[in-house]
């Protein structure tokens, strides 16, 4: 297990009080064969921007020592996760991974429909399922994964994310030039289901809830090439190959279109 907590002085003065009023991060894990379980308990204070902001269009004061808006409490999280990681029999190299998580959020801080920080007075529960399958046939490989989340739907208060997100990758990899350079070339595809996305406030540089704009479900296909030459890695990518096949584009957030098809290069 792992423990991250307030300073030693605070813990020595009163361990239980330090955990109740301070920040902490506790994680315990147990494993048996391909199965494992994890418990995560955490408490953290709101960000400085969530507590205090003064600008031309917005201002708020949620810090305990200031006279103004009600002070925010720490957000606490309890997460329980079960995992499976198993190599599958067959003529190829298969690895299957799956997990299921139950999450409870208390005093969650978010930005409401007016762009102002707010804190949930009730707890919020999430159920998260995840699955991933990786397989290699010689130099060919496939990597597919999907995440499903329940509890953050379109009408959900405070937190909204796509219910389904999937990622798939197919690639070919090998050494060339007498094993002087390792290369990988392939295609990848990203998909997410429709949801009511967050609008963006340039004044506060924060994303906030938006009720009247639904980001449709969309998929983005990309081609990539990676080359490793000793300590140097060269990366080439063309995102959104399928632009124009099912619409001219898509929105990353309300009224903010995502980048069109382009060429990316990195070293």
Task: List the predicted regions and their residue ranges.
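Exposed, low-structure sequence patches enriched in small/polar residues
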Residues: 1-267
């Amino acid at each position: 297990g792992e423990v991250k907590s307030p300073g030693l002085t605070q813990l020595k003065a009163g361990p239980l009080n330090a955990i109740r009023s301070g920040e902490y991060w506790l994680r315990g894990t147990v494993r048996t064969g391909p199965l494992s379980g994890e418990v995560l308990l955490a408490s953290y204070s709101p960000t400085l921007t969530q507590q205090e902001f003064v600008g031309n269009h917005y201002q708020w004061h949620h810090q305990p020592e200031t006279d103004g808006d009600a002070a925010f409490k720490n957000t606490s999280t309890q997460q329980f996760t079960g995992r499976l990681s198993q190599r599958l029999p067959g003529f190829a190299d298969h690895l299957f991974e799956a997990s299921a998580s139950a999450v409870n959020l208390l005093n969650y801080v978010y930005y409401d429909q007016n762009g102002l920080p707010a804190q949930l007075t009730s707890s919020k529960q999430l159920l998260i399922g995840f699955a991933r399958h990786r397989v290699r046939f010689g130099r060919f490989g496939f990597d597919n994964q999907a995440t499903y989340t329940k509890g953050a739907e379109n009408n959900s208060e405070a937190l909204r994310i796509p219910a389904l997100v999937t990622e798939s990758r197919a690639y070919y990899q090998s050494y060339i030039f007498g094993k002087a350079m390792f290369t990988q070339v392939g295609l990848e595809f990203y998909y997410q289901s429709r949801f009511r996305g967050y609008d963006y406030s340039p004044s506060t540089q924060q994303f906030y809830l938006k009720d009247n704009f639904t980001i449709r479900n969309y998929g983005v296909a990309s081609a990539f090439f990676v080359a490793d030459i000793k300590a140097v890695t060269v990366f080439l990518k063309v995102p959104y190959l399928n632009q124009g096949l099912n619409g001219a584009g898509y929105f990353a957030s309300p009224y903010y279109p995502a980048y069109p098809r382009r060429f990316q290069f990195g070293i």
